[in-house]
Curated annotation (Swiss-Prot):
Cofactor(s) in the UniProt record: heme b
Protein name per Swiss-Prot or TrEMBL: Cytochrome b
Subunit structure: The cytochrome bc1 complex contains 11 subunits: 3 respiratory subunits (MT-CYB, CYC1 and UQCRFS1), 2 core proteins (UQCRC1 and UQCRC2) and 6 low-molecular weight proteins (UQCRH/QCR6, UQCRB/QCR7, UQCRQ/QCR8, UQCR10/QCR9, UQCR11/QCR10 and a cleavage product of UQCRFS1). This cytochrome bc1 complex then forms a dimer.
Cystine pairs: none
InterPro entries (alphabetical): Cyt_b/b6_C, Cyt_b/b6_C_sf, Cyt_b/b6_N, Cytb/b6-like_sf, Cytochrome_b, Cytochrome_b_C_euk/bac, Cytochrome_b_N_euk/bac, Di-haem_cyt_TM
Lineage of origin: Eukaryota, Metazoa, Chordata, Craniata, Vertebrata
Extra information: Heme 1 (or BL or b562) is low-potential and absorbs at about 562 nm, and heme 2 (or BH or b566) is high-potential and absorbs at about 566 nm.
Domain of life: Eukaryota
Residues noted as binding heme b b566 in the record, renumbered to the chain: 97, 196
UniProt-listed CDD domains: cytochrome_b_C (cd00290), Cytochrome_b_N (cd00284)
Cofactor binding description: Binds 2 heme b groups non-covalently.
Length: 379
């Protein structure tokens, strides 16, 4: 009798995705982040669910309900901090996952890559709306500044902003709808992640060499299940060190002050994982231009497969492209630093240069370098 694992309609899906999946024998630890993102998503949904049981999405009680969770609910403090720092771990894994895709040419799977970009946008939207919920100073002013950017859209901008706000400013209606969206979006992310995986399994995984590996596949279980468990343990360790020793390390002290529409904080800035995009937004003096640059900073990833001029898929054997890739990483770190600095000299100029360099590397230098490398190999 054939194993039920391979015949039952439900277990068959799990079997073909996580057990008998043919996997390249040489994928490195950089391929761990997909499973880690799945774990992060499950963790965020579970902790978020327990937080939602005690949270109230009303401007008068939102801030005190979060304080109540931390002070009075059994283990509420650890659930709250696991959720807040879990978001940071989520984005660390996301950035490393996208970076892996860029380095090893995983973007040559167009469906998987494009759904990945949609996932990135959706997760960013979810995180932004989640940051508004505690209704601290940075929550309120962050929501005001970012939603206000939509007013830069010609003709319909102002109406659009007021429609999103549910009034003439960020208020009770805004908070309630942000809570509703923040609750539903992770489930949409889960569905998109399933589609992401579906398309990946149509082609099979890429590998560090970028060479087709059909002739050398091994089963996912036990080889990569055990490898993923190691990754999960390291992720859990990092998260719990953060939660138990310095839970507010990545947060903003201003968010411990209740939201006050009459008092603007001296420096309005988003969470650390949005700072690179925020720096690109601020480096353009024109409002509409800034908004376009902000969207394009992520959307530029969709153009990367079209600009792949190399005869090789991966950067493993392309030292010049490797140098450019690490220059891009350094540039993104610079942008992240600039995003957290006040808008004054020399930070403005550094931010503008870093923003120009970001788009130049991805759109101009990488395709040209790939052509140069092809010629060096006499191809």
């Amino acid at each position: 009798m054939t194993n039920i694992r391979k015949t039952h309609p439900l277990t068959k899906i799990i079997n073909d995705s996580f057990i008998d999946l043919p996997t390249p024998s040489n994928i490195s630890a950089w391929w761990n982040f997909g499973s880690l993102l799945g774990i992060c998503l499950i963790l965020q949904i579970l902790t978020g669910l327990f937080l939602a049981m005690h949270y109230t999405s009303d401007t008068t009680t939102a801030f005190s309900s979060v304080a109540h969770i931390c002070r009075d609910v059994n283990y509420g403090w650890i659930i709250r901090y696991m959720h807040a720092n879990g978001a940071s771990m989520f984005f660390i894994c996301l950035f490393l996952h996208v970076g892996r895709g860029l380095y090893y040419g995983s973007y040559m799977f167009p469906e998987t890559w494009n759904i990945g970009i949609i996932l990135l946008f959706t997760v960013m939207a979810t995180a932004f709306m989640g940051y508004v919920l505690p209704w601290g100073q940075m929550s309120f002013w962050g929501a005001t500044v970012i939603t206000n950017l939509l007013s830069a859209i010609p003709y319909v901008g102002t109406n659009l902003v007021e429609w999103i706000w549910g009034g003439f400013s960020v208020d009770k209606a805004t908070l309630t709808r942000f809570f509703a969206f923040h609750f539903i979006l992770p489930f949409i992310v889960s569905a998109l992640a399933a589609i992401h995986l579906l398309f990946l399994h149509e082609t099979g995984s890429n590998n560090p060499s970028g060479i087709p590996s059909d002739s050398d596949k091994i089963p996912f279980h036990p080889y990569y299940t055990i490898k993923d468990i190691l990754g999960i343990l390291l992720l859990a360790l990092t998260l719990m060190i953060l939660v138990l020793f310095s839970p507010d390390l990545l947060g903003d002290p201003d968010n411990y002050t209740p939201a006050n529409p009459l008092n603007t904080p001296p420096h309005i800035k988003p969470e650390w994982y949005f700072l690179f995009a925020y720096a690109i937004l601020r480096s353009i003096p024109n409002k509409l231009g800034g908004v376009l640059a902000l969207v394009l900073s992520i959307l530029v990833l969709a153009v990367v497969p079209l600009l792949h001029t190399s005869k090789q898929r991966s950067m493993m054997f392309r030292p010049l492209s490797q140098c450019l890739f690490w220059l891009l990483v350094a540039d993104l770190l610079t942008l992240t630093w600039i995003g957290g600095q006040p808008v004054e000299h020399p930070f403005i100029a550094i931010g503008q240069l870093a923003s120009i360099l970001y788009f130049t590397i991805l759109l101009v230098l990488m395709p040209i370098t790939s052509i140069v490398e092809n010629h060096m190999l006499k191809w």
